[in-house]
Every structure is written in C-alpha cells, then in structure tokens.
C-alpha cells in the first residue's frame, strides 16, 4: 500500500476474480459423443459463459476490433496500421510476396482490403480463405450475428495464443459473486473454463496523486 504524509491511502492492491478459457481434452470427447466437432463444443461452452456473465451484470473482454451496430451491420473499430495488423494476423499474411503466384497475390490484396463483414465471415466459416484454410472457428448458423461475434472474440484471443496450446485466455475480469456461483455450479457442463484470482492496482483520486506515485 502507498500512503501520503498524512497517512491517507493513495494506492492499494485489490484481489479480483477472473474467468479463463483454455483448450481441454473434454472437447474432443464431447465431439465424439455428440457427433459434432471440437469447434462446435468450444463455441457452445463460450456462449454459455458469456450469457452467464451478461445475465449477472458482468461483461466479457472483447479484443476483436469489430463491432455490431444497432442496424445489424458490422464495422471495424480500428483504422490504419492497427487494422492492417489485425487483418494480417487473421489471414496469416506475410510481408514477403516474392514466392506468391499471381492468384495468391490477388487473394492477399483482397484479404488486406476485406470489409468487417468479410473478416467476420472468414472467422466464422473460412469464407475467403486460402486453399486448405478450413472452417476457422466454425460458428454454427444457429447463433445470431451478434452472439457469433461474441463467441468469435474469445476464440480469436485463443487463436492468437495457439502456439501455446494450453495457455489460458482471460474472458472476464472482476466478476461478481453471482457469476462465480453460477459458473461453479455448472462446472460439469463448462469444460475448459475456470475461475482464478489476480491482484490489480487501485488508485484513490489517481488524477490528483499521479505525480506522486508515477501513474
């Protein structure tokens, strides 16, 4: 803890609860039992957790720079170099084009100029991907566009950590007791999900004391 000269608390550590998602062998087992796919089972679990959080007044972390508008359309929330990097990450676009065929160069250009709707469709089912890309997150059509985007956000965060297969991805921070209780009660139907704790720094009247504590 940090105090001022009068003993008033300026900053302290606060313990909060987080919800995490990671790959689990249970998804493969469920897929075999239900005649589905691992992606289908992952999406089901993520959807259930997001609805639990929303129902209890908590929010989930959305790291994908696409938003759903009130008119039912999609748009990017980033521009310039940030948006270009996002598209490169999504489509796996490298900077070297010397070994690409003409058709591959055309596809590369199309992907770099993809609209929010096109990126969404690619992540949902692989549309506009290169040969052999597959169905990406294979998000079932039963989910609305808005819900599919929410599922996609969690899957995309896990996708960025794909080279560390069992690395946890944080879905939500600072969840309340209602969400904690419901997730724990339904743990048997939520493989790959766990609740953890972490310490965050809290600053009292941070603007007034930032010059003192370097915040």
Functional labels for PLM-detected ranges:
Residues 1-215:
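Membrane-proximal periplasmic segments of bacterial cell-envelope enzymes
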